Design a protein with these regions (language model features):
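Residue-level detector of anion-binding/catalytic polar loops
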Residues: 288
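Active-site loop ensemble at the mouth of alpha/beta enzyme cores that anchors a bound cofactor
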Residues: 304-316
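A general structural motif
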Residues: 314-326, 346-354
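Hard-cation-handling environments
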Residues: 295, 300
Length: 366
């Protein structure tokens, strides 16, 4: 049988561990599900709606195979989009998407057919029949997957109206926001001044300097906490270097708000300092700091201009600068202490140095 019950389980101990863990509830503390879709209990009626309309990992596979963008993010027919995906997938054995897709086909549709052009029609038809009754909706899928909590990814300026509405419902799971601070720290981005203005408006703070920025961040963080948030998440290419005092960060922020150029040293100093202050805010609130390190966003400008963000145009960055990581963690630890911290790296070559580094900060007083 293709993708049988023991796929990936290579010995008896693996089976024993899986049997022990398979029925445990899932706490998904980092995902990109849209809270609006959960609130509206969005119904998925075919595999393209369920799999392809928002999964940029699958889009990368299709682009690599040469599929026209019309059948990836464009206005192509849903069935034809799935057929193009089924044509591409067999060429990517070893890619996690290959395994994910077949595991999902088995778990949710009880189908063990290989996804390929030969089986595309049967897979499409049989899944279509199973989805026709509306049972493949956002809430039913979450509940049916034994998920107890979903933590979404939300910008500090978001109003969290969907989260508040979901919280008023009687669901067997929680949907909590997470304070995603990328746009706060990315001072070099062209729209940063506009973003800071928006942040000030929603926080009720006129941001003219670094202290006002910190006040706005703190107000928005408290707003998130009031709506169930327990964590902040920051994605970055690498750890910044060099703490700056408030006056230095004032000058850097003032230049940026005036649309002036800032160099890499200014950027790093500003990011380091802002992140250190955010870390203290988190510790004071008993929150978790999540750091996603090692990603370069929107590498393909033409693709970004056509399709926007999170469409499959991101890449793995160079090896982690462990010295910078050490300096940041050590500075925060010496100045009030680290909050609970999770560090992810997208570059597998960085796992070993990062694992040894975080071991240096385990067991500190909390």
């Amino acid at each position: 049988m293709f993708f049988g019950d023991k796929v990936f389980l290579e010995n008896d101990k693996a089976v024993e561990l899986y049997e022990y863990a398979k029925s445990l509830p899932i706490f998904d503390y980092h995902c990109h599900l849209a809270p609006q879709d959960i609130l509206g209990d969005k119904v998925f009626l075919n595999l393209t709606e369920l799999w392809l309309n928002g999964d940029h990992y699958k889009w990368r596979i299709m682009r690599a195979y040469g599929v026209d963008e019309k059948f990836i993010t464009g206005d192509g027919d849903d069935k034809e989009k799935f057929f193009r995906f089924a044509e591409a997938l067999p060429h990517f054995i070893g890619n996690p998407v290959y395994h994910w897709a077949h595991l999902e086909l088995k778990k949710y549709f009880d189908l063990t057919l290989p996804i390929c052009p030969k089986n595309a029609e049967e897979i499409w038809t049989r899944t279509l029949e199973k989805m026709a009754d509306g049972s493949f909706s956002a809430k039913k899928l979450i509940e049916g997957s034994n998920v107890c909590a979903v933590v979404t990814t939300d910008d500090p300026v978001d109003d969290l109206s969907a989260h508040r509405a979901i919280a008023r419902e009687d669901n067997p799971f929680k949907v909590l926001p997470c304070f995603r601070a990328d746009r706060l720290i990315n001072i070099d981005k062209p729209d940063y001044a506009d973003y800071v203005k928006k942040l000030g408006e929603v926080a009720g703070v006129e941001i003219k300097g670094f202290n006002e920025l910190l006040e706005a961040v703190e107000r928005r963080l408290d707003f998130f906490v009031a709506n169930g948030a327990t964590a902040v998440d920051i994605g970055m290419e690498d750890f910044p270097f060099g703490y700056g005092d408030v006056s230095q960060c004032d000058d850097i922020l003032e230049d940026r708000l005036d649309e002036k150029f800032i160099d890499d040293d200014d950027k790093a100093e500003f990011q380091f300092t802002l992140m250190a202050h955010i870390a203290k805010m988190l510790r004071d609130r008993d929150m978790v700091m999540q750091l996603h390190v090692g990603v370069i966003r929107n590498c393909n400008t033409a693709l970004f201009d056509r399709c926007g963000v999170d469409v499959g145009g991101d890449s793995v960055a160079n090896v982690l600068n462990v010295n910078n990581a050490r300096d940041f963690l050590d500075y925060v630890e010496q100045n009030g202490g680290l909050p609970k911290t999770i560090i992810y790296t997208l570059n597998p070559t960085a796992y070993y140095p990062l694992a040894t580094l975080i071991g240096d900060f385990q067991g500190t007083a909390y």
